[in-house]
């Protein structure tokens, strides 16, 4: 370890502490998850429905696309309502009217303030006190049963083909007969009711509901808990302290060894003879850009569905290709092409680390992995389509069709195939890199890279730790291990280490600086990133301890982003540090874009939805979409594109990039993304946020609110940014086609 010992100690300490917290509080998620009652019963003991009905309803909901049609507990798609908040408001409204008529002979809205307060207090008491008895059942009053049945009827008809709700389905981008079987719809409604029950029932021993008073519902006086407010303030203080510490350490820890670098006259990587496995990566690059274009095409379709919910410019597309499938393919395609770019970058760099040599059968392994990825993409897309079309038997939907959970929509069997493919990539990487340890010299940078490769290789696995009928709180815990920890955590560490290796190999960064950056990034990104996973779980049925942990540690994730301006400047400086660097101009420009969007998308827009008191009001609004697009595409998308063009530069060195085409594509992608956010998603999100704060989450997601002319116009305005973005992607795709298929000189 030598001079790097303190950095390795920091990484090990962060991993031990971080995973201890994540694991220990994970047991709290399991033990404190809101119960699923054995049955809901009437006061005279009649069974209304059972736990088995709820679990069957969960499966039925998954078969519709689940979180791809509206949201449950705030997680999912943003066009239709949040079914938890929507059901709760509808049911409580009916309940208030019933109680008002019983007490005063008039509807709730017709009462005076004093009478309304009295009725509301009675209803609040009943909802909060709807506890599970010792026998595992929950008793519902006759009034609540009536309110539940009236509300349930609406959802049964909405997911069917009742002509009275055709316009509503159009506004929600739902096809007719989203769930064809009546019994499935009835049980799905029971599943929705259960989510509202836990969102309105008091957690034993606390003054809040199981979901920490979420969603904001004025009819029940659902407001942020004192803990949510307090820990939001603490998170801001932690953020400011963290920024101060990082800037201090950065300023005093800077070394001047970079100024002593003697830059090479020629590109060192260009002098390394390409191995067969590296030359085999061309098909990866083509597929990555093709999937990128496909993803944007799906994005254009779902954006149009927000203004014309059952058609595409008059073509009745939804019955055959509904919003839920377009959104599923949009998300899955993005994950596939970004992951494939990262895998390609690793496979390209591994032989360089190994002194320009391939281990035996490495090219065969690279080819096998590619075709396995093709089978995975085609097969999982077909599975999700057939699942939502209900062409797969219900018992097989979770395995082969649509899991119903955002970002992990593909069926469980396809998920296993994906994980096996990632593990196969891990084997290819390790067997290629391991020989480098026989070389002379320091091995710390190699060790850091292997560490990041192993983390990427194994941490997709937790997505397999929940099942079809797992509790939503438990499912969300493991789902965010993949989305947050695997992608936002270990992908970040992998990319930083890979970039360090590339710049060290190019002679633009000293070995010491590259090694320190690679190792320390693990500690810096993961110190907040591992326990910070909990900030996605505030309102999914967890305790206030998890809220406090998520708020505190996730604030630290923003801290290193304050130095991204300097990182962008360093990358720009490297571009002009040697004459031969102009050939790497566009990959470096992509890396500069990563720094910008990391600060804006992950930093500014990420922290906007990070604090508990903020997320309490804006969970599931378009503010989340702002963060998702600017962070996922702005950061990981541009990083992936940078990797693609870097690899293309070296595997086809005789072909020059078309500078005008690349310039157009680069700026079109950046400007298109910025316009999509600034003139559409962000204004919609902010308007929704105000509506949620003043009227409740149900209203901010309601048909009445979302169909206002202003919001319709803002959704149409997205067409401007989307069009520019797609044109930029076409330019990049065409450049890769020209490079890969140009005649070899």
Descriptions of predicted regions:
Residues 1-50:
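Post-cleavage N-terminal segment of exported redox proteins
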Residues 8-28, 57, 61, 211, ...:
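Hydrophobic cores of alpha-helical transmembrane segments in multi-pass integral membrane proteins
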Residues 31-229:
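Soluble extramembrane regions of membrane proteins in the secretory/endomembrane system
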Residues 40-45, 311-325, 617-620:
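Perimembrane loop-to-helix junctions flanking transmembrane segments
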Residues 66-72, 77-111, 116, 357-429:
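Hydrophobic or amphipathic alpha-helical targeting/insertion segments
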Residues 92, 258-271, 444-447, 697-698:
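Juxtamembrane inter-helical linkers in multi-pass membrane proteins
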Residues 256-281, 357-360, 574-584:
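Membrane-interfacial, low-structure loops and terminal tails that flank and connect transmembrane helices
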Residues 404-412, 441, 474-484, 541-553, ...:
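Non-cytosolic membrane-interface motifs at loop->transmembrane helix junctions
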